[in-house]
Amino acid sequence: MLVASTVAGPGASPATAQQLSGSLGQYKATITVPVSPQQAWRVLTRYEAMAGLMPDIKQAKVLSRQGSQLDLAQTYQAPYTFGLPIKARLRLVEQAPRQLSYSLISGERIRSLSGSWTITPVQGGVKLEHRIAIDPEVPAFLRSTYFELSEANLLESMRVLKRLMLQP
């Protein structure tokens, strides 16, 4: 169970360290990336292209779009899913280029899921923040393991997004 963690690579300053706080399915992950808000937004909203790039997203398909709202089908498979492919349908609301909110429409083995991505301009780039609230449908004896594995996945996801945002 994670309360707060700061992870910095070799030579990273505290300003560029990624942070994860929260526990038991309620998390906030942040990282600073030296890119424009528009570049961060472009990467964050390449929904279908994220399949295979993000550590847990195996498939992604935009099912419908109406203005700033869209429905997205995703299949997750990662250590926190215990190797099982888990399908979910999400409703996303975009507020370009600053915020993306999402909520669960339907899903396998997920009681509830909601969250947001926020892009905030800071000196030298943007602060990317991901807030997530998830209640998995897993047996009680597996919940702590699920959350530990989810925390590791959140940190890895932030690292991957930063790497993708830094690509030309």
Predicted regions and their residues:
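Beta-strand/loop substructures that line and gate deep hydrophobic ligand-binding cavities in soluble
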Residues: L104-A152, E156
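Glycine-rich portal/gate segments that line the openings of hydrophobic small-molecule binding cavities
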Residues: K61-E108, E156-P168
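Short strand-connecting beta-turns/loops that link adjacent beta-strands
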Residues: S36, R65-G67, P97, V122-G125
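Hydrophobic beta-strand positions in extracellular immunoglobulin-like domains
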Residues: V33, Y76, I132-I134
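Short, surface-exposed coil-to-beta transition loops
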Residues: Q26-K28, L84-R89, R111-S116
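Sec-dependent N-terminal signal peptides
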Residues: M1-V3
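Hydrophobic ligand-binding cavity/cleft-lining segments
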Residues: V7-G67, E156, R163
